[in-house]
Amino acid sequence: ALHEAFPPDGAPAAGPAQALLQRIAQIPRVSYCGNPLVNSVLSLKSRRAQELGIHMEIQVGHTDTGQLHNLELCSLLGNLLDNAIEACVPLTPTGEPVILVNLHSQGHLLVLAVENPVATLPKSSATGEYFTTKANPERHGLGLQSARRIAQQHDGCLLTELKGSCFRATAMLSTEIRSGS
């Protein structure tokens, strides 16, 4: 699948695409499922977490992605995992925080749940949506918005909850083929 990103003459893709492909090519191959791009994202994020002193437990069951484009799935995974990793970094001096990742199909739904401890409780709006506490909020806090948008585009939703000092984001997306698609 990744070799398809290279032009037919065998020359590597130019620019940012080339840099991304080179980075992905260096990732140790771990097979979580039958989708090589999902495997690459999970491997990349797991490796990054490990480098930061964070343990990631990944469970992937049968995954039927149906109409979901690989780019959307990788964006969803990447955004939720980046948020979880970032939330765990302040906890590493006192131990090894654990991020739990579960990706599976349930009927005609693809379910992705990411759970992580937090050092600072995130702020939420009156509607229960969480938002960034970083400086320059116009340039940050887009990960959950993006994940929510992807879920909604696929007749699904993104649920977020905070229990004690544990944050959980669960994306549910329909994998049914829409009529007219």
Predicted features and spans:
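Short alpha-helical Gxxx[C/S/T] motif in the catalytic ATP-binding
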Residues: 143-147
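Short beta-to-alpha transition helix within the HATPase_c
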Residues: 18-22, 26, 34-51
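Short beta-strand/loop element within the Bergerat-fold HATPase_c
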Residues: 95-108
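A short, flexible helix-to-loop-to-beta junction within the catalytic ATP-binding CA
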Residues: 49, 85-93
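Glycine-rich/acidic phosphate-handling loop/turn and adjacent ATP-lid/helix
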Residues: 108-141, 180
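Conserved short strand/loop->alpha-helix "switch" segment adjacent to the catalytic nucleotide/phosphoryl-transfer site
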Residues: 30, 56-77, 133-135
